Amino acid sequence: MTTNWLSDIEQSAWRNFVTTVPDLEAAFEADIASHDITMGDYKVLVFLSEADDNRLRMCDLADSLRLSPSGLTRRLDGMVKAGWIERSACSADRRVMYAHLTDAGMNKMRAAAPDHVESVRRHFLEPLGAKGVQQLSELFSRIRHHLQQTQDA
């Protein structure tokens, strides 16, 4: 079997993606650092803020964040200590644990949100322009759909 190597343009697209994503993440991280929060913690707060009753089962939160259960536990330990979230057991099934956004966590997220949105606009959206944003959204939707199809198969 022979390897179907990437063409020059395919290699360029792939390398640009692989190198740009960490650069974007670093820029977003730097732009909210003054709020004493990491992007990882910010993402947790956002997911919880969008959930019913501002809480999610730990397994669902881990899936949403693409973290292992132990990775989520490590992520949440500091957030619990900071008072941004609380963990609680499900009253109907003690094996199920919830992460719940506290008022302090909501306030932390709301304080960082304007700087995060500005960072997303400056580093991600503005360089693309309106047409580029539309195209990129469609392209990533196609990739996401493909990944979901292959994972379900």
Task: Label every model-predicted segment.
Residues M1-H35, W84:
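N-terminal leader segment of winged-helix/HTH proteins
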Residues D77-E138:
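Charged, amphipathic alpha-helical coiled-coil/dimerization segments
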Residues N16, K43-F47, N107:
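Pre-recognition alpha-helix immediately N-terminal to the DNA-recognition helix
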Residues M1-D8, A130-A153:
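C-terminal regulatory/oligomerization modules of transcriptional regulators
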Residues F17-T20, L24, F28, L65, ...:
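Alpha-helical linker/hinge and terminal dimerization helices associated
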Residues P22, A26-S70:
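N-terminal helix-turn-helix DNA-binding core of bacterial DNA-binding proteins
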